[in-house]
Every structure is written in structure tokens, then in C-alpha cells.
Amino acid sequence: MENQKNFLTTAPYKGTRDFYPEDMRLRNWMFSVMRETVLSFGYEEYDGPILESFDLYKAKSGEEIVERQLYDFIDKGERRVAIRPEMTPTLARMVAGNLRNLPKPVRWFSIPNLWRYEQPGKGRLREHWQLNVDLFGVDSHRAELEILLIADSILKKFGAPIGSYQIKVSHRKLLDSFLKNSLKLNGDQVHGVSKLLDKKSKISPEAFETEMKPFLNNFKEQFSLIETYLNSNLETVSKIPGIDTNSVSFIQNLFQELGELGIDKQLLFDPSIIRGFDYYTGCIFEVFDTNPENRRSLYGGGRYDNLIGLFSKEQLSGIGFGLGDVTLKNFLEGHNLIPNLSREKTIFLPIMDESLFVDTFKLSKELRENEILTETMLDSAKIGKQIQIAEKKGYRYVLFLGESEIRTETVQIKDLISGEQKSLPRKGLSDTLKKDFQL
């Protein structure tokens, strides 16, 4: 019996994806829509290293990320480093390092590659890309207004109809006042209760109640007040004793102006919005998919006024959000918003005969110089086989350049979808393809 060789697996690392050309077409389209939308608001793109000091995340990221999700190791220089799980700490470091030279307000965005060691599931992978949009240097609610407009505009740019998503808004000071003033909790209790509130939607009501008991002194009364808070609206929440009414007024004013700008139908006050990151200090929000098969948070963000405090004595207000590519793709698929991304906009040019290789390549060069995407075969296989390749690759239009076409200064174009084929004059060919075939 012959020895069997143990081949390496062709599967990617758990929680990651291979991006074949068809996958890259989708990813590039998603990124281009996001990028174009944010650029239209005057934002500038930035990037940073995928490796950072472990201390940066220890200081700025949430407890769950640092203790359970961080990919970290000791490098060859005996430094403890980590692969970035989020972009905000890097952003804070970069802004603080060049603070005096940056004109305010600072409007930046990025689409970085991020890593977290967590159990893969729907909408969650260990490696993903995330649009990060951040605005620094504006203290007023107009910063929240602009960020929420961008968050809304992105989904509209993808063609999302009204009702397909909902923007839920709350305020961190509202929650803090409820926990400290209304429930009269101490520091450890505040920490425990807020963590439970953040994961409430992921556990059963029974588990939520059971896990809440150790943090409450007068369970029945305090738990009843928690339920009242979670079920309140902008009118009723302000009636809870000890609540921060300034936060309520802030959200009311914000909603009024956003309504005047046409996005009131998507807005909802929801005090259960917590946002797990420890650095949020003000208004917070999450965008939710309303599809019954994918009722989950798509993305979110909020204000973080103390973000650069570890790097500088200067204060700089900031607000931003992050939108991951995995949850966005699920949303687009669930609402049938992904367009036809096949190679219909690219010409396929077979070689009719070996003697016509140079003429064929001259034609492809001419088309590309006129900004028409063109793939040219590199050998003169049987024409039927070349057509099969074009069909398999998803092309729609094939150009034929044979000896008779060269003599008559024409080309033949065939639509592989309809089967129609006709002759086109070689003169002005690029203009004809753009005008009549939308290439």
C-alpha cells in the first residue's frame, strides 16, 4: 500500500473568510458605497498599524475585549503587542499625537481589518472589516446630528427602504443617573448591572432576573424600577426620581432637528441601549435591522469626550460609530439590496486565429485606453471553448475580430444573455459601446 501524503487543509482559519473574485466584487462595492457616502460629508480617510502596544487596548478597550477577545503576543523585542480588535484606540493615539496641527473639527474615517478571538456565528467572525466614522472638536449636539445623518445616509445609499431599519438612541448620563441616583447603587453594583443590561437581549428573562439579584440590595423594588426604566419613553423616563433630565432634553432637541431633516421615522428612544465600551460618555445609538429573520444590531456608536485623556492633558470632544462588513452584508442580503455584480460591464475578447493575436491585442488596448474594461484571451483555442470560458466567468458581451472584420473595419458583438449578435463599425467603437451598451 502506497504511503498517503498528508496534505494541508484548504480551509481558512476558523472565523475568517477567503475572498474569491466574486466575493471581492461584493466587498469592493460595499466599501465604495460606504466610502462615497462619508466622503460626501467632507470626511478624510486615514489608517494605522494593525499591531499596537497591548497597553493601548488595556487602557482604552472594554474588559471583555482585553480579557477574552484580544490576539496578543510577545514580539522578538520582548514587547507585548496585540492585533487591533477595534480602531478607536489607534484613532485616539493618532489624534492626540498631532492635536495642535489638526484643524477643527476633525472629520476622519477608515475601513480597517480587525481581529477578535470569539466564537463565530451569524453576524460575527474573528476577522472582519469595519467602517469607522469619527468627528472631533464639536461640543454641541450638532455633532450627534451629523453622525446620525451619516449613519442613516449610508443605508439609504444602499437602497434601504424606510422601515427596514431603526435607529435607537439613548444617553450614557441618563443610564448613570438611573443607576447611581434612582437605584442608589455603588461602583461595583453599577458595573455589574450595566453589564447585565448590555447583554439583556442575548439571555432569557429568567436568566436576566437571576443574574441581577446579587447586584441589588432591595431586589423586588429595584428590579421593578429597572423594568420601568427599560420600558419608558421620552415622556415617562423623566418622571423617574433621580433621572438626569438634561439628557432627556438633549435627546428631545436632537430628535426635533433630525425630524426637520427627514429622518424622524427611523428614530426611536430606547433606554436599553447601553453600548459595551467603557469610553462612551454621552449620546449613544444603535442601528437595528427590522427583518424578522435578522432582528439584531447592525452598528452603533456614541460620544466619547475623554478619549485622548491618556495621551494629553488637553480635552477634545469626540463622537463616532463603527459599521462591520459582516452585519452589513447580512442586512443587504436580507432586504435583497445587492445588485447584479457579475462581469457584465467587461468586454470579453477571444482570439479568432493565432495570426490575429496582435490585431486583437491592439483592439483591447484601444478599448482600455477609452476606459472600457476588457479581458483578452491569450491563446487561440476553439472559439466554442473560449465562449464557454466567457459564460463561466459571467461576461455578457463578447467582441469578435476575425479576418473579415479587419477587412471591413468592423467587429461583431454578441450578447450572451439574449443570444443577439450584430456588426459594429470599428470607427467610434468605444463611444458606441458606452452609449448603446452602457459599458
From Swiss-Prot:
Got a GO cellular component term for this one? Answer: cytoplasm
Keyword set, alphabetical order: Aminoacyl-tRNA synthetase, ATP-binding, Cytoplasm, Ligase, Nucleotide-binding, Protein biosynthesis
Query: Quaternary arrangement and interactors, per the entry?
Result: Homodimer.
As for family, the record states: Belongs to the class-II aminoacyl-tRNA synthetase family.
The family database entries (PROSITE patterns) matched by this protein are listed as:
AA_TRNA_LIGASE_II
What subcellular locations does the record give? Cytoplasm
Please spell out the taxonomic lineage of the organism that makes this protein: Bacteria, Pseudomonadati, Spirochaetota, Spirochaetia, Leptospirales
Query: What are its E.C. numbers?
Result: 6.1.1.21
Task: Output the Gene3D superfamilies linked to this UniProt entry.
Answer: Anticodon-binding domain (3.40.50.800), Bira Bifunctional Protein, Domain 2 (3.30.930.10)
Q: Does the keyword Manganese apply?
A: no
State the top-level EC class.
ligase
Q: Name one GO molecular function term.
A: ATP binding
Point out the gene that encodes the protein: hisS
Major subcellular site: cytoplasm
| GO BP annotation list | histidyl-tRNA aminoacylation
Which reactions are catalysed by this chain?
A: tRNA(His) + L-histidine + ATP = L-histidyl-tRNA(His) + AMP + diphosphate + H(+)
Entry-linked PANTHER family: HISTIDINE--TRNA LIGASE, MITOCHONDRIAL-RELATED, HISTIDYL-TRNA SYNTHETASE
Name of the molecule in the record: Histidine--tRNA ligase
